[in-house]
Amino acid sequence: MLIGYTMLLRLNTKLAVKQFILASVGLIACAFIPLLLGKFPQVRGWRNFFAIAGILFLITTLIPGLKMTMYGSSNWISIAGISIQPMEFVKILFIFFAASSLVKVNEFKELVINACIAIAFMLILILENDFGAVFLFYITYIMMVYLATSRPIFAIGGIAMMVLAIFVGYILCKHSLFAHIIVRVRAWKDPFAYQQTDGYQVSESLFGIGTGGFIGSGLGRGMPYLIPVAESDFIFSAICEEMGVAFGLELILIYVSSFIAMANVAMKCKDPFYKYVTFGISVTYIMQVFLNIGGATKFIPSTGVTLPLVSYGVSSVFSTLIMFAIVQYTYTLVSKEVDDFEDEKYRIIQKARRQRAREFAGNAPGNAGPSRERTQNQ
């Protein structure tokens, strides 16, 4: 977060101060999330609630008077002058829905029904032109299903279906629903050919990274403000320009290590519900990093997904803090499981030692002889 604040102060002081204040409030609020999860263990059975709440929250972006269109996507709403991106919070509800449904899956029919509900989330996101979120939700769900079933066929089949859906959708709707995506793909394929139009964002992003080089031009000495949406979608390019590609690689390593730590917590958790939740959070987290940095470096088309805890965006920061708080709760469960295991292990060892001590005392030569003699004399 400090990296994000530093860059935001460089780009836009007003936005940096706003994000700092709201993120501080979010940190305090998120401190209570592990306590709330501990008080409500029945959340694992709220599958229908998570599904309905998530879908209804997404639908608010389609309501005239509430919805806002920014950067080609209608995935924002405005309440009392405050811009909110429902997708950032719905992704948490989606993960909880997926986890609660996978815990109860006993038949293939149930898996199909749950998959249809998951697709409903994604269809609404398609109507909002938020294809980055669609990809994020889809990969997260496929990976959670794979973890729950341990069947690679579901993961392979899911990815194949995604590719097929993209191809068919492109053919059928390339001049309407997918027009926004076509612009981004064209800018991705050859940004310098459309440098003054569709490829302006990507070309300036690449110029910024190239200008900074390996060690950067120095904080305050570059021109990251020339990069469009540098405070959000392309903040990684701004960081590389002034702090260097080396610093950018270090930032990527921080994200990867965080992902590994969260995935490790998930794998150690014996509670299947929170195991799936934490794993889903870890996948969502690292996929956001991939989509943002991949778009900024022209590895993939730009998706508009924010860089967790670095990009400007109150909704993004709040949702990421909430996810970290949930992982923290899972970590407490794992710690408790380890403590219980160690206590049980210690109890068993002590019991075995006492048993061996009694056997040794009963079989000792000095004890057996005299006791028999006293018995005979009596």
Residue ranges of model-derived segments:
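P-loop potassium selectivity filter motif centered on the GYG triad
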Residues: 96, 102, 210-218, 308, ...
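Long extracytoplasmic/lumenal interhelical loops at the membrane interface
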Residues: 209-246, 266
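Hydrophobic alpha-helical transmembrane segments of multi-pass inner membrane proteins, especially
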Residues: 1-197, 237-297, 322-326, 346-366, ...
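Transmembrane helix boundary and interhelical junction motifs in multipass membrane proteins
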Residues: 130-135, 215-219, 230-232, 300-303, ...
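Transmembrane alpha-helices of multi-pass inner-membrane enzymes
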Residues: 298-343
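Re-entrant/interfacial helical elements at transmembrane boundaries that shape
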Residues: 137, 220-226, 254-255, 297-306, ...
